[in-house]
Swiss-Prot record:
Gene that encodes it: vif
Family note: Belongs to the primate lentivirus group Vif protein family.
Assembly: Homomultimer; in vitro and presumably in vivo. Interacts with viral RNA and Pr55Gag precursor; these interactions mediate Vif incorporation into the virion. Interacts with the viral reverse transcriptase. Forms cullin-5-RING E3 ubiquitin-protein ligase complex (ECS complex) by interacting with host CUL5, RBX2, elongin BC complex (ELOB and ELOC) and CBFB/CBF-beta. Within the ECS complex, Vif interacts directly with host CUL5, ELOC and APOBEC (APOBEC3F and APOBEC3G) substrates.
Region named Multimerization: 151-164
Modified residue annotations for Phosphothreonine: 96, 188
Site (Cleavage in virion (by viral protease)): 150-151
Name this polypeptide is given: Virion infectivity factor
Ranges that cross the membrane: none
PTM sites of type Phosphoserine: 144, 165
Region ranges (Interaction with host APOBEC3F and APOBEC3G): 54-72
Keyword vocabulary terms for this entry: AIDS, Host cell membrane, Host cytoplasm, Host membrane, Host-virus interaction, Membrane, Metal-binding, Phosphoprotein, RNA-binding, Ubl conjugation, Ubl conjugation pathway, Virion, Zinc
Region (Interaction with host APOBEC3G): 40-44
Species assigned in the record: Human immunodeficiency virus type 1 group M subtype J (isolate SE9280)
Length: 192
């Protein structure tokens, strides 16, 4: 019998970002209790030698599994040191991979406070709007006009430490152009 390969999408992430993600998950599971239903599996709980950790997030009947890997093939850049993350949605025997934005939306649907359906009406009538949205990462694109109006009216609290975001975990911070402020342009470089 020949070998069968299974391909998975693994987002390349640097080690420090994975460590930050793990500590945020553990904090909100054990201290703040906002993610108390989540399950954290250490590397020694897995049979796979490349798995660093797994976070199982129940979403109703389904489970979102965020797996971190180590010892992977290094990337084309020096800082791609063989660390990665995969995001999988499981329900019974069905499994599929999801992107980080969708993962954050799925997490936000089941966990962390957001504006209630009656928040717009309450805001128009001048009543106190409660609860406020705690998980900004769950709204990955420009929201509805009502959501934008509510966020302008009720500023979200800055949480210390922040809630764990999958999109923030896999964000590519290496290939973004550097933003420099307060520096004048080099006239010799611009040809002026």
């Amino acid at each position: 019998m020949e070998n069968r390969w299974q391909v998975m999408i693994v987002w390349q992430v640097d080690r420090m970002r994975i460590n930050t993600w793990k500590s945020l998950v553990k904090y909100h599971m054990n201290v703040s209790k906002k993610a108390r239903k989540w399950l954290y599996r250490h590397h020694y709980d897995s049979n796979h030698p490349k798995i660093s950790s797994e976070v199982h997030i129940p979403l109703g009947e389904a489970i979102l599994v965020i797996t971190t890997y180590w010892g992977l093939q290094t990337g084309e850049r020096d800082w791609h040191l063989g660390q990665g993350v995969s995001i999988e949605w499981r329900q019974r025997r069905y499994r599929t991979q999801v992107d980080p934005g969708l993962a954050d939306q799925l997490i936000h649907m089941c966990y962390f406070d957001c504006f209630s359906d009656s928040a717009i009406r309450k805001a128009i009538l001048g009543q106190i709007v409660s609860p406020r949205c705690d998980y900004q990462a769950g709204h990955n694109k420009v929201g509805s006009l009502q959501y934008l109006a509510l966020t302008a009216l009720i500023r979200p609290k800055r949480r210390k430490p922040p809630l764990p975001s999958v999109q923030k975990l896999v964000e590519d911070r290496w290939n973004k152009p550097q933003k420099t402020t307060g520096h004048r342009e080099s006239h010799t470089m611009n040809g002026h």
